């Protein structure tokens, strides 16, 4: 590209006039071009030269486009560059990477002289702006690079993290290559090699994306992951698909790059923002001290003398929440010495005590585990966890890698304990107060998916590992059994609530028998809620919450009565009727009038609807006549979502037509309860939501739903419903 642009320049400006220069900037200035990258150039000029050669420059630009170069061009004087750079961090960043292509060499030298730190963007201000820019970029990606469709360039741990380090180094030292940083002592040889290897890997991934898509593409979408994995030579094996193996390498690479980004920015901060001599130092214990707002080891050999201190430093961070992080040199020691966490250290009572104490402490646990994972300590101490680091779950539901998902589940269990998050799940916030040992819930969360990716039943394998871990770490047999049971059964409550009829007394009796006692029900309910919420934000809604809460409450009643005295159907029906009857009497209905309407329906109707729903249905059911059918009611019920109730004569195709109408209206059907009466009518209830989980607008959508259903169900024999819903791109890659 350099040679092409120089040739085009020479064609239209053969005399190479003074006062004009062609300069590469941005990624092109860094000499980082991929097949479909933007080619960013700067036409640097003096005012009189631009006027003299305007026509030739316009021809140069037009010809570049004509021959297929995707050129992004700016035209500026040196004064323009200085003014724009002073106002915008992105402009100064772009110009830092300026590289002369052809033309008057004096101009780029004068521009660089006008942009030195003593004139615009002092080193400290530049560094702080770049840190803020990176933090904002991280927030855009929810502070994780481990989502299942990452951006190779912009996600945390991506190429932009390497660029950020280079920009800060260039601003501070005048040169920003990795080799320069190594020569200046900011990088060890191993760190430099890791950065080069990670950068090369991500470049190759981006190159593959450009070749596969035929355009600029930086996101590793599901469409492309399989093809890129094939280009990298991966094939399916007994345990993991090729795409999962490739993506695990990707996630582990960005994890390494993210650690090095942390390390280098911390080193820069210490070098740029102040002298160590000015920071107050106070001892924390014989191995660690506080320097300013950071923790550091007292010398370079701490972890080699006491490898268990690799856990102690994180425990100290947990005990001293005002500490902002780990000093750079100590972080470098952690990255260097984490390999010392071998079987001997894992058996050391000091290591075991420190690790389990983090869970008993509770406060700061999530942040600590994330740090330990980020710096490789968690996977070293728990080899089973190390195996799931970066492991993707190529399915319709999970949005994070297994290790990130597990840590989000731990986070959710911790949030149940915190008053400031009580409004997220008020019922769970109340249940968690009854736990005698919350640390057992956190351990269940940590181990619940730790055996994924090995083949076999991950719940069974994980339960065995959890029990061994708990006993090794000094927990009682009863506590170890509880954690193992939680891991083994962590899917049971979700599957029961979503795939079985929780209004059926037999379902409740069976589930209660498997749970056995109220305390286990509390733990399992909380783990289930935390797990679903961490799997995919779109999976959690008021309907699922209500199902789990209903299952919890009915099971709690069954356990309180005793497993030998299960709830009977007639008792449940009588209770529901009594509560609904009271609601209606309070509204002015008579008992005889209520019972007369209800006589048309059998027990299933009362078992499958709440008292509030029965009270809502009643006035319409009392007034309905053959001429007014089909009866269609729509209402948003507290904590259950939007309910659509249909009452009409039983005829063929009603279910297909009803669901077809709802699908055509762009609604997701979350639940369907279908009931046929003994006198030939149907009572069908659907719980629906917008596809993006937005609340359904009563003013617009309720009349639309009612009108469309009544229109189609009025003549089901001749009605047809065609549904043509766009399939989200993610679903196209799975068998559904």
Task: List each language-model region with its residue ranges.
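Short, charged/polar, Gly/Pro-enriched secondary-structure boundary elements
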Residues: 88-91, 494-497, 690-697
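Divalent metal-dependent catalytic cores for phosphoryl transfer on phosphate-bearing substrates
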Residues: 31-56, 183, 195-197, 201-203, ...
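Conserved catalytic alpha/beta cores of large enzymes that bind or transform nucleotide phosphates
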Residues: 68-73, 82-85, 338-359, 414-420, ...
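Alpha-helical phosphate/pyrophosphate-handling elements in metalloenzyme active cores
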Residues: 3-16, 21-23, 168-183, 399-441, ...
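Non-catalytic interface/linker regions that flank or bridge core catalytic/transmembrane domains
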Residues: 2-24, 31-33, 37-398, 467
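Conserved structural-core and active-site-/substrate-pathway-adjacent residues in large, well-folded domains
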Residues: 1, 38, 64, 162, ...
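Regulatory modules associated with amino-acid/nitrogen control
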Residues: 201-202, 241-295, 367, 506, ...
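Long, amphipathic alpha-helical stalk/connector segments used for oligomerization, subunit docking
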Residues: 96-150, 501-517, 521-551, 555-558, ...
């Amino acid at each position: 590209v350099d040679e092409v642009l120089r040739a085009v320049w020479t064609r239209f400006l053969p005399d190479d006039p003074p006062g004009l220069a062609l300069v590469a900037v941005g990624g092109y200035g860094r000499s980082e071009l991929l097949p479909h990258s933007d080619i960013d150039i700067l036409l640097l000029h003096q005012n009189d030269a631009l006027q003299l050669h305007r026509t030739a420059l316009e021809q140069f630009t037009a010809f570049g486009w004509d021959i297929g170069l995707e050129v992004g061009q700016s035209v500026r004087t040196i004064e323009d560059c200085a003014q724009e750079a002073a106002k915008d961090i992105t402009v100064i960043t772009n110009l830092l990477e300026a590289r002369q292509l052809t033309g008057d060499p004096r101009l780029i030298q004068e521009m660089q002289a006008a942009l030195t730190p003593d004139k615009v963007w002092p080193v400290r201000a530049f560094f702080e702006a770049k840190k803020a820019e990176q933090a904002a970029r991280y927030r855009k990606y929810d502070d994780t690079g481990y989502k299942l469709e990452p951006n190779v360039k912009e996600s945390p741990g991506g190429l932009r993290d390497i660029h950020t380090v280079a920009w800060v180094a260039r601003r501070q030292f005048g040169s920003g290559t990795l080799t320069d940083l190594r020569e200046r002592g900011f990088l060890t040889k191993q760190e430099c090699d890791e950065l080069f290897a990670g950068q090369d890997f991500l470049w190759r991934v981006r190159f593959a994306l450009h070749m596969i898509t035929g355009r600029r593409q930086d996101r590793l979408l599901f469409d492309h992951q399989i093809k890129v994995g094939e280009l990298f030579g991966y094939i399916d094996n007994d345990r993991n698909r090729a795409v999962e193996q490739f993506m695990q390498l990707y996630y582990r690479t960005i994890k390494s790059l993210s650690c090095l980004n942390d390390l280098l920015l911390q080193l820069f901060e210490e070098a740029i923002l102040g002298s160590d001599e000015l920071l107050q130092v106070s001892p924390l214990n014989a191995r660690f001290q506080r320097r300013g707002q950071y923790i550091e080891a007292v010398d370079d050999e701490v972890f080699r003398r006491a490898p268990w201190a690799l856990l102690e430093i994180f425990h100290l961070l947990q005990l001293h929440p005002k500490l902002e992080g780990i000093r750079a040199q100590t972080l470098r020691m952690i990255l260097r010495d984490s390999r010392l966490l071998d079987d001997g250290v894992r058996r050391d009572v000091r290591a075991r005590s420190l690790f389990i104490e983090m869970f008993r402490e509770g406060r700061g646990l999530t942040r600590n585990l994330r740090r330990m994972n980020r710096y490789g300590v968690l996977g070293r101490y728990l080899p089973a966890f190390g195996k799931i680091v970066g492991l993707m779950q190529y399915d319709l539901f999970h949005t994070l890698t297994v290790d990130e998902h597990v840590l989000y589940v731990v986070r959710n269990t911790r949030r149940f304990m915190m008053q400031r998050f009580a409004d997220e799940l008020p019922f769970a916030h109340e249940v968690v107060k009854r736990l005698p040992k919350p640390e057992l819930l956190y351990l269940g969360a940590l181990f619940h998916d730790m055996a994924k990716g090995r083949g076999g039943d991950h719940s069974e394998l994980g339960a065995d590992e959890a029990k061994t871990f708990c006993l090794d770490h000094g927990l009682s047999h009863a506590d170890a059994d509880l954690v193992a049971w939680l891991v083994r059964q962590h899917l049971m409550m979700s599957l029961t609530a979503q795939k079985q009829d929780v209004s059926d007394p037999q379902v409740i009796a069976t589930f209660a028998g498997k749970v056995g006692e109220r305390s286990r029900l509390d733990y399992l309910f909380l783990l289930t809620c935390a797990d679903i919420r961490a799997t995919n934000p779109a999976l959690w809604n008021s309907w699922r919450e209500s199902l789990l809460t209903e299952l919890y409450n009915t099971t709690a009643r069954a356990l309180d009565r005793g497993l030998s005295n299960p709830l009977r159907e007639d008792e449940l029906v009588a209770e529901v009727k009594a509560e609904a009857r009271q609601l209606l009497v309070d509204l002015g209905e008579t008992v005889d009038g209520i019972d007369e309407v209800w006589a048309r329906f059998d027990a299933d109707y009362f078992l499958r609807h709440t008292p509030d729903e029965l009270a809502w249905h009643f006035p319409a059911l009392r007034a309905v006549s053959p001429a007014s059918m089909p009866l269609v009611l729509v209402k948003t019920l507290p904590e259950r979502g939007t309910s659509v109730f249909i009452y009409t004569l039983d005829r063929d195709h009603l279910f297909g037509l009803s669901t077809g109408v709802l699908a055509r209206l762009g609604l997701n059907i979350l639940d369907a309860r279908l009931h046929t009466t003994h006198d030939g009518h149907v009572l069908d209830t659907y719980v629906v939501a917008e596809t993006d989980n937005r609340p359904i607008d009563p003013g617009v959508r309720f009349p639309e739903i009612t009108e469309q259903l009544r229109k189609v169900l009025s003549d089901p024999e001749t009605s047809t419903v065609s549904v043509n819903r766009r399939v989200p791109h993610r679903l196209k890659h799975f068998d559904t």
